[in-house]
Amino acid sequence: MLFHGIPGEHIQGIMEEMERRSKSESRLAKTVQMNGRETSMPSVSPEKPALCAGCGSKISDRYYLLAVDKQWHLRCLKCCECKLALESELTCFAKDGSIYCKEDYYRRFSVQRCARCHLGISASEMVMRARDSVYHLSCFTCTSCNKTLTTGDHFGMRENLVYCRAHFESLVQGEYHAPLNYAELAAKGGGLALPYFNGASAVQKGRPRKRKSPAMGIDINTYNSGCNENDADHLDRDQQPYPPSQKTKXMRTSFKHHQLRTMKSYFAINHNPDAKDLKQLAQKTGLTKRVLQVWFQNARAKFRRNVLRQENGGVDKADGTSLPPPSSDSGALTPPSTATTLTDLTNPSITVVTSVTSSLDSHDSGSPPQTTLTNLF
C-alpha cells in the first residue's frame, strides 16, 4: 500500500540511502567499542596495586593523597600527636617517619622556643624580645602581677624573669637595708640627734639663734673659763646621748694653745659671732666654721650656767655645791677697763683674759657690745 503509486527509480534511491546509513551506524558502534576497551585497559592491567603508607592496605578509592613520596588513604593521613586529619590542610610535616601538623611540629622541633612557656615559636608569629630571650606576645608578662607588657613599657629582668617597673624597683630596694627611721628611733629612745662631721653641714647664714633645741644642743663638760698654757683643751662633739642599745664612738676635737686663746679672748668681747666673724676666725685659727660655731655655742651655755649660779646665791643646781659669796665691796661685777684685741692675744707677753664672766653685769640681761673681727684683725 505504501509503495503502490511510487515509481521504481525513487524506490531504488531510498534503498541505497538506507543501506548507507546502516553502514555509518555500524562503523560508529565499532568506534565506541574500541574507545571503551582502551579506557578500561588500566583496570585490567596486571600491575601491582598501590598500598597506603598509613594502614598498609591496598588503595582502591578513586582519590588518594601523595605525601612524602608515599600514597595515603584520605582517612589515614593524620597527625601522630593530636590525630588531626590533614586531608584538608595545606601543609604537613614529617620527622623520622612520623607525620605532624604545623602546631605540633613547631612545638616539638622549632629552633626558637618561648622563654616563658618553653613552646615553639612559628616563623610567622609576632614575638617580644628581651636581651637574648624570645617570648610569645601573651607570655611577655610580669612574673609578680601577670601584667601584660607592651611596646614602650619599662621592665626589668632578674634571672631571665620579667618584672614590671614597679615590682622590679621594689625587688631591687628589698636587697638593701631600709634607711633608719630617725623619728621612730627618737620616739623609742627619748630623743635622737643626727651626728655631724667637720665641714659637712651647710653654713648657716646670718647670726645663729642664741637658744637651740635640745636635739641640736651639744654638751661640753671640759670647758673652763681660764686657760692653762700647759694643757690642750678638748671639745667633746657628742650630741644628746644615744639610746643604750646604740653604742657610738665619741668624736673629739683638740685645740692648740693659740687657737684656744683666740677663741676665749673673742668670746670675752662677743659671745655670738656672725658668719663673717666665724669666717675670719676660721682663717685665723685654722679651724672650720662648724667647729667654731659649736665651741661658741657651748661657751655660751657654760657662761649662762655660771651667771645663774651667781644669781641663785652661789648654789649650783646641778651638784648642790656652794660657791663663795660675791665681794661685799661692790654688788655688781666690774667690766674690764680696756678691751684686748686678738692681735694682742696671740702675743705671749701679754696677759690673757682668764675669765669670761667679768665682762657681763650679773643684773644686766643684755649682751656686751659687739665688736667685729675686721677691727680686731
Swiss-Prot record:
Q: Where does the signal sequence lie?
A: none
Domain of life, per UniProt, equals Eukaryota
SMART domains (UniProt xref): HOX (SM00389), LIM (SM00132)
Q: Where is the composition biased (Polar residues)?
A: 365-377
Q: Which residues form the LIM zinc-binding domain?
A: 50-111, 112-174
Print the keywords alphabetically.
DNA-binding, Homeobox, LIM domain, Metal-binding, Nucleus, Repeat, Zinc
Q: What is this protein called?
A: LIM/homeobox protein Lhx9
PROSITE patterns with a match to the protein in the record = HOMEOBOX_1, HOMEOBOX_2, LIM_DOMAIN_1, LIM_DOMAIN_2
The function of this protein is: May be involved in gonadal development.
**Gene Ontology MF: a single term:** RNA polymerase II transcription regulatory region sequence-specific DNA binding
Q: Where in the cell is it found?
A: Nucleus
What is one term from the GO cellular component aspect held by the record?
Answer: nucleus
* Record feature DNA-binding region, as residue ranges: 248-307
Q: Where is the composition biased (Low complexity)?
A: 333-346
Write one Pfam family the protein is assigned to.
Answer: Homeodomain
Q: Name one GO biological process term.
A: dorsal spinal cord interneuron anterior axon guidance
- What taxonomic ancestry is recorded? Eukaryota, Metazoa, Chordata, Craniata, Vertebrata
Region annotation (Disordered) maps to 228-249, 309-346, 358-377
